[in-house]
Amino acid sequence: LELAAGTGLIAKHIVNAAAHIEATDASAEMIAEAKRDNRSAKLHFSVQDMFCLPYANQSFHVVIVSNALHIVPQPEKALQEIKRVLKDDGVLIAPTFTHAGNSFSGMVKAFFMKLAGFPLRSKWTSEGYLRFLRQNGWAVRKSAVLKASFPLTYAECVKSEV
């Protein structure tokens, strides 16, 4: 399952390694764009609300939510819903931009993200983001900070409360 899939870049890239992928986004426009060049019967795109997913408990081995938790309201509620649909031995892959403590140039980039319709609702440092995941019932199995225009913290997690 990929949440906040946007145009489907990640799902399309990894589809050959999976039996089936459900890729969702809250934006009908993004899903329409993702469907436009989907060539795999193993990949299904749909408009869904990550806070109220239509899937049964423990439906997925892997959930990916990339670059989204910092822009959604109440990311802890999204994590609760992810925990519900993820199998007990499943893996959450949740890279997100970690803007807190950035330089002036980082603040300027955040301003332009807001203008583009992606306001920062959670401004974490890398350490703060990993702490947030742990406080919400996740054990961080792997993490790394990737330096780019915005620093990105990659987090690979498993349920800490099963």
Positions of predicted regions on the chain:
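Class I SAM-dependent methyltransferase SAM/SAH-binding core
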Residues: 1-3, 7-52
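A short SAM/SAH-binding and catalytic strip from SAM-dependent methyltransferases
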Residues: 62-74
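A short acidic, Gly/Pro-enriched loop at the edge of an enzyme's catalytic core
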Residues: 51-62
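Short alpha-helix
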Residues: 121-136
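A short glycine-rich, Lys/Arg-flanked "PGG" loop and its adjoining helix->strand segment in the class I
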Residues: 76-88
